[in-house]
């Protein structure tokens, strides 16, 4: 019998675990429709702010040999644009899973207002709160401030009752894994997304003796193959620390079916693809699904749950 890539996530059944990372192929309704027609299991909107944002000056995204560097600055069409889209799609395709919604306020108050808009709407899908954008000048990554993160989540769950996940930055210290997991376990969070890009990297054009992006003197978030070991470590660390009801989306360095398998083996249930989706287009989902299925067949697994989270240690 052929293996299945079907996964259950936050009360929804998806035909496979793949989706776009917020920021790629999700800015406009045309791009979101392209995602809907693709072989991905799900898709997510661009991280929305209260009003439309142009983002940082260009050049702000550059593909580099093992990934990408970006300092986009949260360009988006605003919450009303994306909420209108998901509600319209929800009405037109009632038997389908709604898209994920992503929000990223520029302040605590803005995050609360954005989530109130979603809570007060008829949206039946899953929302992702981005607490980890490293590319807005003058704005720190919220999720590196543990006390502030705790305060935000406490305020959010006073009113928000729909499924809510949190997108996290990468952590590099066991004490930080412990501290953040302790906070997350206090709240009815549906999932965590590990990880956003690794913030404030630098890539240099040696011929020009110059940085390659304009914002922040060339400092930007690193994505792609560079960050896969860090992403896997974060997925695994949180899988081992979070209570069983909190699921994990693995994001970072997924280019092949083997990369996807590794994220799932570490404990992820869904997978987001950013850099390689930007490079290859939506055809990447069909390819990675096929490669992942082939791995399951070779290993004799019938489903993702046969191996998810079962990474072995060396005794």
UniProtKB/Swiss-Prot annotation:
One protein family per Pfam: DHO_dh
Active site (record annotation): 133 (nucleophile)
Pathways involved: Pyrimidine metabolism; UMP biosynthesis via de novo pathway
CDD domains: DHOD_1A_like
GO MF term set: dihydroorotate dehydrogenase (fumarate) activity
Binding-site list for FMN: 46-47, 130, 167, 195, 224, 252-253, 274-275
SUPFAM superfamilies: FMN-linked oxidoreductases
Keywords of the record: Cytoplasm, Flavoprotein, FMN, Oxidoreductase, Pyrimidine biosynthesis
Cofactor remark from the record: Binds 1 FMN per subunit.
GO biological process: 'de novo' pyrimidine nucleobase biosynthetic process; 'de novo' UMP biosynthetic process
InterPro entries: Aldolase_TIM, DHO_dehydrogenase, DHOD_1A, Dihydro_DH_chainA_dom2, Dihydroorotate_DH_1, Dihydroorotate_DH_1_2, Dihydroorotate_DH_cat, Dihydroorotate_DH_CS
Needed cofactors: FMN
Main location: cytoplasm
EC assignment: 1.3.98.1
Subcellular location: Cytoplasm
Enzyme class: oxidoreductase
Catalysed conversion reaction: (S)-dihydroorotate + fumarate = orotate + succinate
Gene3D superfamilies: Aldolase class I, Dihydroorotate Dehydrogenase A, chain A, domain 2
Family: Belongs to the dihydroorotate dehydrogenase family. Type 1 subfamily.
Subunit note: Homodimer.
HAMAP family on file: DHO_dh_type1
Stored NCBIfam families: PRK02506.1 (NF002702)
Job of this protein: Catalyzes the conversion of dihydroorotate to orotate with fumarate as the electron acceptor.
Name of the molecule in the record: Dihydroorotate dehydrogenase (fumarate)
Organism: Kluyveromyces lactis (strain ATCC 8585 / CBS 2359 / DSM 70799 / NBRC 1267 / NRRL Y-1140 / WM37) (Yeast)
């Amino acid at each position: 019998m052929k293996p299945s890539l079907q996964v259950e996530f936050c009360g929804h059944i998806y035909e496979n675990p793949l989706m776009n990372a917020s920021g790629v192929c999700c800015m406009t309704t045309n791009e979101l429709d392209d995602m809907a027609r693709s072989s991905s299991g799900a898709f997510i909107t661009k991280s929305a702010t209260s009003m439309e944002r142009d983002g940082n000056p260009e050049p702000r995204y550059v593909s580099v040999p093992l990934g990408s560097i970006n300092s986009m600055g949260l360009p988006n069409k605003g919450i009303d644009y994306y909420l209108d889209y998901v509600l319209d799609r929800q009405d037109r395709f009632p038997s389908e899973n709604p898209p994920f919604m992503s929000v990223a306020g520029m302040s605590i108050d803005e995050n609360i207002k954005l989530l109130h808009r979603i809570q007060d709407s008829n949206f039946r899908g899953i929302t992702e709160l981005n607490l980890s954008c490293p590319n807005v000048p003058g704005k720190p990554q919220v999720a590196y401030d543990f006390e502030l993160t705790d305060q935000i989540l406490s305020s959010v769950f006073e009113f928000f009752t729909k499924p809510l996940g949190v997108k996290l930055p990468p952590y590099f210290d066991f004490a930080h894994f412990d501290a953040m997991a302790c906070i997350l376990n206090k709240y009815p969070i549906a999932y965590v997304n590990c990880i956003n890009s690794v913030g404030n990297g630098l890539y240099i054009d040696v011929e020009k003796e110059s940085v390659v992006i304009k914002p922040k003197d060339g400092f930007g978030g690193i994505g792609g193959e560079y960050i896969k070991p860090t992403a896997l470590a974060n997925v695994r660390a949180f899988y081992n620390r979070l209570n069983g009801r909190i699921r994990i989306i693995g994001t970072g360095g997924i280019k092949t079916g083997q990369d996807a398998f590794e994220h799932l083996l570490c404990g992820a249930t869904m997978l987001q693809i950013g850099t390689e989706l930007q490079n290859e287009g939506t055809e990447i989902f069909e390819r990675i699904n096929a490669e992942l299925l082939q791995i399951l067949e070779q290993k004799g697994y019938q489903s993702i749950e046969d191996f998810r989270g079962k990474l072995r240690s060396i005794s």
